[in-house]
């Protein structure tokens, strides 16, 4: 009875972890950015002034951007909801042009360093998703049997995927805080527009990832415990 409960909750947490991984992997909202350029003439002033801003959102596959008119004190996160986005937007492959890097600067050292860092980030995320999915298939195959090795292998894969995705989250934090060189990008743009500002924040794809990590790690520990229990009782 206790073994069945462990298998049930392990399967439940594992399924939730895989689902969250797939959503975070497939959605392009790991990074949100807003560029405001107040250098044009006849610019409105005041707390409720409306400005034309450029919004970016980026994930594993794509980096997209679109123009949006908003008030100075508006909530940036709300502007990225599908219902609030522009009818058309421009997109490019994120691994070739991660924000704020641009392929026009392909000869610069910072661009190549960003691509290398981004490449490792992509690899860790892809490995995390694949490892969790394979672990899920192993557990499904182990369900009709009492083979402790399959349960332990599945549990180990879930824990490995949790560690890989934890590295993805940590690397993304470092990317936003230092590697992407937001300050250098802002300084460069301010040479042409002294009132240029850029705001960068973590998107909901990033915020989902820790929940997937928790579920996969917990599922992995449960399946390791199930495998150990089966092994003890079959001796």
Curated annotation (Swiss-Prot):
GO process terms (BP): muscle organ development; myotube cell development involved in skeletal muscle regeneration; myotube differentiation involved in skeletal muscle regeneration; negative regulation of myoblast differentiation; negative regulation of myoblast fusion
One Pfam family, short name: Claudin_2
Gene3D superfamilies named in the record: 1.20.140.150
Locations listed in the record: Cell membrane
Record flagged with keyword Lipoprotein: no
Cytoplasmic side: 144-155, 227-235
Signal peptide: 1-33
Disulphide-bridged cysteine pairs: none
Extracellular-facing ranges: 34-122, 177-205
Keyword field: Cell membrane, Glycoprotein, Membrane, Myogenesis, Signal, Transmembrane, Transmembrane helix
Segments crossing the lipid bilayer: 123-143, 156-176, 206-226
Sugar attachment sites: 48, 90, 107
Family per similarity comment: Belongs to the TMEM182 family.
Function text: May negatively regulate myogenesis and skeletal muscle regeneration.
Protein name per the record: Transmembrane protein 182
Organism: Xenopus tropicalis (Western clawed frog)
Origin organism lineage: Eukaryota, Metazoa, Chordata, Craniata, Vertebrata
